[in-house]
Amino acid sequence: MKASQSFLATLKEAPSDAEVVSHKLMVRAGLIRKLSAGVYNYLPLGLKVIRKVENIIREEMNRAGAIELLMPMIQPAELWQETGRWEKMGPELLRIKDRHDRDFLIQPTSEEVVTDLARNEIKSYKQLPVNFYQIQTKFRDERRPRFGIMRGREFSMKDAYSFDRDTEGLKKSYQIMFDAYTRIFKRMGLQFRAVTADNGAIGGSGSQEFHVIADTGEDAIVYCPDSDYAANLEAAESLALIASRAAASVAMAKVPTPDKTNCADVAKFLNIPIESTVKSLLFVADQENGPAKLFMLLVRGDHELNEVKASKIPGMAESRFASEAEIKLACNAPAGYLGPVGVSADATVVADRTVANMADFVCGANDAGHHLTGVNWGRDLPEPLVLDIRNAVVGDPSPDGKGVVDICRGIEVGHVFQLGTRYSEAMGCTYLDQQGKAQPMVMGCYGIGVTRLLGAAIEQGHDEKGIIWPISMAPCEVVICPMGYEKSEAVKAACDQLHDGLLAAGVDVILDDRNERPGAMFADWGLIGAPFRVVIGDRGLVDSQVEFKGRTDAESQNIPLTQIKEKVIAAIQTTKQSIV
């Protein structure tokens, strides 16, 4: 391919609304152009990267036995009403009405549609297991689209859905998809981690996320360098940091702590470690019938509450922070001075594992301007309900017992779920077993953010010059840069011969035949991220030499013209082999 046929559209400056590196570089490199908030045109080079990503995904999904189909972007509301997600998903659904005033939506995902397909087409256990997948445009009406394609409203996604006879079958299908995802991201040349995750709005019994490791990632990944343990911060288990509770050594006392409303200030004022303080948080869970329920959650002063874990406490799924009036009623004190001693008997006290093993701790006294010191469980207040409700921190013991954890940042690009029978039971998706009895199909679902992968790869691979693509994703494998393509017959002939020879060998090559200065040409391809560059000019041809340079190489090499084709092919093959 020649550059004159590729519609190169590079820019010197990034758009003013671009916040992250990937957004800036994708616009500057001519991969995307913004149409409206969270909606983008993909220019030819950007589309070429998408097609390479899709091809890898499609090859591995087919290899794993999944069957490709295509489901409509527009879906009827009735299916989503069957599962309750029409109401639950709220404003994220882009809802539309047709001319007959019937409700539809633009799909954000397709569990309902594929379940409807399965219940109409699959009748017998003999037809199971089966796994359908599609690569299709999705839409989620994000409140605040940002970060370019990383958090857009319209995006491309590969979503797959497995149907099995039972849970054992689901586990096998799930593992097949997990292995396929691992191969996909390895082939793309990305540094990634598979982590234990929360199921979120899709539901189900178990899930794992695949994250591309990047300092700018939105998600915190808790992992153990000495083992394979990794989990999203929301789902990472936090063990008790104190092996067992010490005996009480002092009497409880109320002490003045004027204007000290957080644990750090209290610890400094009392000249004690912050690890000796306890943070008290009051929540309210409103009930449809009857009075609201109160929950006081306790974490150590230097720890943070994990709200996802808290939402799984029985009765707290729809809870909220208590208002000032509710705090006053339950504790007779303002926020900042709350504590479990003397709290309303209507409140359920839940202590994190570490707090449950603390002795002689400091907490709010439920009295403005005062805290309690020397507080002990059993003596000064009843034993609490003990649960894991905090965020993990660096240095925590790894839940698998193989060292301590660290935390890095990641960008979620894939998610696999064991859905179970949530959707099949809600929608009557059944099959007849060997005894002729109707059984609900057991489902799994598996997603990959196709367009998001472009942004994630750039966040992971870039420098001051531009994008550093993994070779399997790059818009080309090598670019040929002539010095005077239209001015020198010798240069033109050498470039054309190399271009045609590489094409015949199956190399993805671009010949930059534009009338551009060498510096501008080199800057463009450094920005776009061509993995390899060949420079051919009259000066080098005098000695039958050309320049060869890798995208991250400090210096170029002089290669004999007669050997450059083999050099390029060998470099590409070596690079590809290093990432598989």
UniProtKB/Swiss-Prot annotation:
What's a Pfam family this protein contains?
A: tRNA_edit
Q: Which top EC class is named for this enzyme in its record?
A: ligase
- Entry's localization field: Cytoplasm
Keywords of this protein's UniProt record, alphabetized? Aminoacyl-tRNA synthetase, ATP-binding, Cytoplasm, Ligase, Nucleotide-binding, Protein biosynthesis
> What is the role of this chain?
Catalyzes the attachment of proline to tRNA(Pro) in a two-step reaction: proline is first activated by ATP to form Pro-AMP and then transferred to the acceptor end of tRNA(Pro). As ProRS can inadvertently accommodate and process non-cognate amino acids such as alanine and cysteine, to avoid such errors it has two additional distinct editing activities against alanine. One activity is designated as 'pretransfer' editing and involves the tRNA(Pro)-independent hydrolysis of activated Ala-AMP.
Q: NCBIfam families, alphabetically?
A: PRK09194.1, proS_fam_II
Assigned EC number: 6.1.1.15
**Domains as described in the record:** Consists of three domains: the N-terminal catalytic domain, the editing domain and the C-terminal anticodon-binding domain.
Which species expresses this protein natively?
Polynucleobacter necessarius subsp. necessarius (strain STIR1)
Per the UniProt record, the lineage of the source organism begins with:
Bacteria, Pseudomonadati, Pseudomonadota, Betaproteobacteria, Burkholderiales
Q: Which domain of life is it from?
A: Bacteria
A GO CC annotation recorded here is: cytosol
Q: Which protein is depicted?
A: Proline--tRNA ligase
Q: Main localisation, per the record?
A: cytoplasm
Gene3D superfamilies, sorted: Anticodon-binding domain, Bira Bifunctional Protein, Domain 2, YbaK/aminoacyl-tRNA synthetase-associated domain
Q: Which reaction does it catalyse?
A: tRNA(Pro) + L-proline + ATP = L-prolyl-tRNA(Pro) + AMP + diphosphate
Q: Which residues belong to the signal peptide in this entry?
A: none
Output the InterPro entries linked to this UniProt entry.
aa-tRNA-synt_IIb, aa-tRNA-synth_II, aa-tRNA-synth_II/BPL/LPL, Anticodon-bd, Anticodon-bd_dom_sf, Pro-tRNA-ligase_IIa, Pro-tRNA-synth_IIa_bac-type, Pro-tRNA-Synthase_IIa_type1
Q: How does it assemble?
A: Homodimer.
What family name appears in the similarity comment? Belongs to the class-II aminoacyl-tRNA synthetase family. ProS type 1 subfamily.
**HAMAP family per UniProt:** Pro_tRNA_synth_type1 (MF_01569)
Entry GO MF terms: aminoacyl-tRNA deacylase activity; ATP binding; proline-tRNA ligase activity
GO annotations under biological process? prolyl-tRNA aminoacylation
